[in-house]
Amino acid sequence: MNADAFRHFYNYHFAENRKIWDRYITPLSYEQFTQKVDYSHGSVRDQIVHLIDAEDMWFSELRGANPSDPIPPANSDDREFIRKHWDSVEQKIREYLASLQDDMLFTKPIKEPEEDQVLFVWQVLLHVVNHGTDHRAQLLRELSNLGFKTEYQDYIFYVYENLQGAAK
């Protein structure tokens, strides 16, 4: 386990997030984007906002910083605002990952909340990507219910696609 492996894994995570946004979220009608779903965090919009807020919260804890303000209700339906906010959170994560060193993986930098103080950096890093995979799967199911033909998000296909690109 090393910092480069985590950077690679997060490149997969970011690529899958963008793929879902570009292929499926962008073409949704307002009604589809905000349609109430009786599962998990609700609508497609609410799932996306939850993903953004959770990633921001975890990486803020790792940095010892306060998370960004949540997306205000007045902007919660504004996809352009949400995308810009998500881009900002992703950029902060990329900056953290760029400075990540192997020895940091085995530190416990979180001060609050108390239950998170036992977590090593590597555990938080794995959790965030796993959490993203879980919610993308939920989103893909909901998008399928809305009539979209969705695609896989398996890590191994990301590897294959990037190996092929590197071999050319």
Protein language model regions, located:
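Helix-adjacent hinge/juxtasegments
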Residues: 64-103
